[in-house]
Amino acid sequence: MDKKLSKDAYGGVKGKDYVPYITSGDKLGGNPVVMIAGIILAILFAASTAYSGMKSGLTVAAGIPGSIIGSGIIAAFAKKKGILGKNLLQGMSAGGETVASGLIFVLPAVLLIGAKISFIDGLAVGVAGVLFGVGISTLVHDYLLVEEHGNLMYPESLAISETLVASEGVGDSLKFMGIGFGIGGVIMLFTGAFLNKVNNIISYVNETFYKWRLEVEVSPMLLGIGYIVGMEVSLMMFAGSILANFAVLPLIGYFSSFAAEGATVWNNPDVAINAMKVGNIAGSYLRYIGAGIMLSGGLIGAAKLIPTIITSVKKTLSAKTAAKGTEESTGMSRIILLAGIVISFITGFVISGGNILMALLTTFLALILAMLFVIVSGRLTGTVGTSNLPVSGMTIASLVLVTLLFVGFGWVTPENNKSLLLFGAFIVTAIAMAGGYTQSQKVSMLLGGSRNEMSKYLTIASLVGVVTVVGTIMLLADQLVLTGADVQFALPQANLMATLTEGIISGRLPWGMIIVGIVMGIFFYLLKLPVMTVAIGFYLPIATTSIILVGALVRKFIDMTAKSEADKDAKLANGISLSAGLVAGSSIIGLVGIILQVTGVIKPSEITGFAATNYMAWIIMLILLVLVIGILLRAGVKNAEKK
């Protein structure tokens, strides 16, 4: 692993003078094998990101896992394509994941307001968002990636490029992903998501004077997410859950005990306030306080973007139309952008239900907002990477503006709310695509790949991702609309979008709790805490955030066992591959299980006896930890022996 990128990749030279890693020979990395493998990876990352993101509220950028796994695939099936083939596979992986991380923020909200999603509607807004996002990104490609080389670092692009350059050291990536897939799949097979044979929730709840709840869902998928995102994010999310379950929940429980007889919960007249249990408090109160914190975080994030928006627009307008030394004509880019605009207007007419004025005004506003935030998203990716891109903040700001347009014109029916959210799904997809595009194209620039080839492969993967994500959401529709404290899919961002738009349109938003959440968010911001991360932890079940923290702790432990920097790098690569497998295996098997349950092929029985106890869940936890830690430690020993 002694190969490195040139130091010029990190700056010090003008972008037009940068000499890429590959300077001679064929600049194309694609062939039918690479395309097929990329489509498979796009489907895999799109489905697993949609499933895990709707459950945990977190999405994991696929660029680095895709680069590691892609290295193994190219080594096994397309050696001649080398590093440029690996580059295309990481880009296609990112394309599938990027679409999912955008669409799941808004599209499920249509279901949450009681409306239905047609496959055509979901496909149309997704395709329009992909094409428009890629099209606008190509217009600022030279400015963001070439002219700003060294000023915008694109940290995750550099990490992906370094991983690909040193890819001889990660030849075991496919093996570790396969092991992770197997572990995740087998455990998921026996839990509620499939056969429902064993309990995998460790649960301790107190319903007396000091009400609290501590739970851990033994989930390979969530443990894998925790390993990938690391300690800082996991700890902040868990802090939000601690605040919700051990401070705010007991406080509400204490004061509710003094409520008068006959007083009932505001949204559930069958439950007396003085008799509320932990689940009632979580579902009727904590949820809306959490939504307020998320709203606060989103608006603060949007406000902080104002200087970036101004800078981005100014520099984009003043940038040279074409930097010298860039390759190929922009013909394909213009076609993609034009197709995105045309499909956007056609989609606008379809989802507006025949309201021509709504279609014209809202599509125009959505295109303006999407264009603005696509530029901002591409620039911010150069600073913080796609993993930390404030997509939710930009989406909330956009939705608030579109909602105000709807209210101003009197478009306030439930059907209008559905149209509003579908326009929002278009905007968020375009915003997310900008991050995926600029990050993948920066890798191509650093390595010496073809710009047009990456655009083509990335766009195809993203369109495949749209089909996959919309199909996944429709298959899971019955599970996604379930409400309560212990639902399988918490949908934090989609719930926020539904609550926000429906509340503004109907005027029935529980403002008292929302404002409490907003004030808490401002308090977190003043303490310099990541508001949205803490807010998601507050909103999610503690069972979800606790196992994510366990995954981060496992990574911390594995890192501590490294005997050298090289050993640490090898363990990190192995751990990410294994974790990607855990996420993919659990998600795919979970999806298959739900499909089989819905179609009546399998009928899970009720868990009874020892299999239903906390002891059973603890045993599964022990097995999972022993397998993951044991495999990674053993791999570290083998790596050391090889050296």
Q: Where are the predicted features?
A:
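Alpha-helical multipass membrane-protein architecture
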Residues: 1-643
